[in-house]
Curated annotation (Swiss-Prot):
GO terms for biological process, alphabetical: ribosomal large subunit assembly; translation
Gene name of the encoded protein: rplT
GO CC annotations on file: ribonucleoprotein complex; ribosome
Name the UniProt record assigns to this protein: Large ribosomal subunit protein bL20
Keywords, alphabetical: Ribonucleoprotein, Ribosomal protein, RNA-binding, rRNA-binding
GO MF assignments: rRNA binding; structural constituent of ribosome
Role: Binds directly to 23S ribosomal RNA and is necessary for the in vitro assembly process of the 50S ribosomal subunit. It is not involved in the protein synthesizing functions of that subunit.
One Pfam family hit: Ribosomal_L20
PROSITE patterns per the UniProt record, alphabetical: RIBOSOMAL_L20
Family statement: Belongs to the bacterial ribosomal protein bL20 family.
Cystine pairs: none
Coiled coil regions, renumbered to chain: none
NCBIfam families given in the database record: rplT_bact (TIGR01032)
Database matches in InterPro entries: Ribosomal_bL20 (IPR005813), RIBOSOMAL_L20_CS (IPR049946), Ribosomal_protein_bL20_C (IPR035566)
Length: 118
C-alpha cells in the first residue's frame, strides 16, 4: 500500500487562510486555528452586512429627504404620498441626491406634492 503524503496541500490551505487573515490583530493573523475562526466569522459578518447595507442606505436617504422636506413645512410621509398622487415616480436615492445638490428642483417637487394633496 502506497503512503499518502498531503503535507503540501495542508500547507497551501493554511497559507491561504493566513493570507486572508492578514491585518488581523495578534494571534488572529499568525496562528492557523485562531485565524481560521476569525476568517469564518469575518465571512459571516460580511454576509450579514451586505444585506444591512441596503437597509442602512435607504434609512439615510429617507432621513435626508425628511430633513429637506421639513424646511418646506411638510412631513416626509405627506411628501411621498403627494408624489404618488401626482404620479411622480422618483426613488428615494434620487430624491435625496436632488435634495442635496439641486434644491430648486427639489422645491418644485415639494410644490407639486402639495398641489396633489389639495
Amino acid at each position: 500500500m502506497a503512503r499518502i503524503k498531503r503535507g503540501v496541500i495542508a500547507h497551501a490551505r493554511h497559507k491561504k487562510i493566513l493570507k486572508q487573515a492578514k491585518g488581523y490583530y495578534g494571534a488572529r493573523s499568525r496562528i492557523y486555528r485562531v485565524a481560521h475562526q476569525a476568517v469564518i466569522k469575518a465571512g459571516q459578518y460580511a454576509y450579514r452586512d451586505r444585506r444591512q447595507r441596503k437597509r442602512q442606505f435607504r434609512q439615510l436617504w429617507i432621513s435626508r429627504i425628511n430633513a429637506a422636506v421639513r424646511q418646506s413645512k411638510m412631513s416626509y410621509s405627506n411628501f411621498i404620498f403627494g408624489l404618488k398622487k401626482a404620479s411622480i415616480n422618483i426613488d428615494r436615492k434620487i430624491l435625496s441626491d436632488i435634495a442635496i445638490f439641486d434644491l430648486l428642483s427639489f422645491n418644485a417637487l415639494v410644490k407639486k406634492a402639495k398641489e396633489a394633496l389639495l
